[in-house]
Amino acid sequence: MMNLISFETPPLGRRSQDGGSSSSSITAATTTTNKAKEAASHLDLSLGISLSPGGGGGDAGTKASSCCYGGGGDGGGCMGSGMLTAGVLGVGHGGSSHDNTTASSGGGGSWTAAFMPSPTGFMHPWSLAARQQKAAAEQERSGVARLPPATTTYMPRAAATVISLPAAVGWPPVHTSRRNLVATINNVLKPDTTAAVKPDRPTQATAMFAADETTAPPPRSAAAATEASRTLNMFAKVHMDGYKVGRKINLRAHRNYDSLRRVLTKMTHNFFCPADYSSTNKGEEDCAKSDEFIFLYEDFEGDRMLVGDVPWELFLASAKRLYIAKNPAPRNKGTYRPLVWICMLLPKAPY
């Protein structure tokens, strides 16, 4: 006996409802996937990298922009998967751009592979590496254009050697060469204080050295002796009324006015007798009481002044000549003639 199996057929409305729900769910999933792929492709286009891990992202169809210079070139489309594929630039006459298709990366790769250079040797024109290469190429071209002529001069190796200066020593840090230069200048300008110059009169020490030549002091240089004589010797001319011949005395050999007056007073007794500096104490009383003559000096302005009015150092600095004149008003006569005194002090007018 045959058993009849009944096949239940779902109602038409229920089947269509079930089919519609399944198809709508599939459509929604497909739409979500497409939106995600489109967003990823847009992000890839903006960043120039692929963010899909493993390179397994959906295909992003992009048309590559093409430019042709100098001829009828035609652009071609580029299909990319994973990595972004940029446009192809065709340069030339009658050239045509070809289709570029980049294969997607193998599964299981890291997303950092997007930062590695493309296997096809492509580089994004706006990337940092591309700009660096462009700048290097421009610099190289400009350097080639600025090359000097073929005549090249070669410097010897010895000339290129840098001479090292001595190290700075002390504080402030000054090089040794400059310190030696300053020391040399100071030694030249420093006066010789060890050499003491004495007056022109003979002394006991000089006589002892003259007697024993073996122990005589070393001679000084001529320049040092001349400089010392200029500072310690100051000779001035002495004129006396009634004598056409003058005398010279060393003013530096005297320390004050009294010593100078004694020498000049001795000249009044015997003008041509040489002045004996060793016997200055002889006849001091007679010299002090004598007022028959007066002593004048001529300063640097040419005026005649009375000896003893200014300090001794100022007198040595300004005295050029000495005059022995007769006293217009001696004590023994007791008369004073100011007119004659003024006439004697006035310089004679040239004829």
Swiss-Prot record:
Tissues/organs with expression: Expressed in roots and seedlings.
Any one Pfam family match given in the protein's UniProt record, by short name: AUX_IAA
Biased composition regions of type Low complexity, renumbered to the chain: 21-34
GO CC entries: nucleus
Domain PB1: 233-327
PROSITE patterns associated with the record: PB1
Cell compartments where the protein resides: Nucleus
Superkingdom assignment: Eukaryota
Key words, A-Z: Auxin signaling pathway, Nucleus, Repressor, Transcription, Transcription regulation
Region (Disordered): 1-37
Description of what induces expression: By auxin.
GO BP term, example: regulation of DNA-templated transcription
Subcellular location, principal: nucleus
Protein family (similarity comment): Belongs to the Aux/IAA family.
Subunit structure comment from the entry: Homodimers and heterodimers.
Role noted for this protein: Aux/IAA proteins are short-lived transcriptional factors that function as repressors of early auxin response genes at low auxin concentrations.
Note: Lacks the EAR-like motif (domain I) which is conserved in the Aux/IAA family.
Name of the protein in question: Auxin-responsive protein IAA27
Organism annotation: Oryza sativa subsp. japonica (Rice)
